[in-house]
Amino acid sequence: MVQAIAIAPHMEVVGSDGVHVGTVDHMDGSDQMKLTKTDKDAGGEHHFIPLAWVDHVDQHVHLKKSAQDAKAQWKAAA
């Protein structure tokens, strides 16, 4: 499992298909990432992605889900 400490602000998040999902704003606790609201796909809202969706981290955060699935299932900030 990926450690939350491996994820840093401003890292690009990509789906399993290599398509851009968003940009990390910061880790929210130890189990979810908060994405920036200024990203082109964010619609002006922060979105949360569970750490459980992360496959691995290198210079990007790679998800186990495709970008389309991640965006369909991410949680908007209240």
Tell where the protein language model's regions lie, with residue ranges.
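Peripheral interaction segments used for macromolecular assembly
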Residues: 1-78
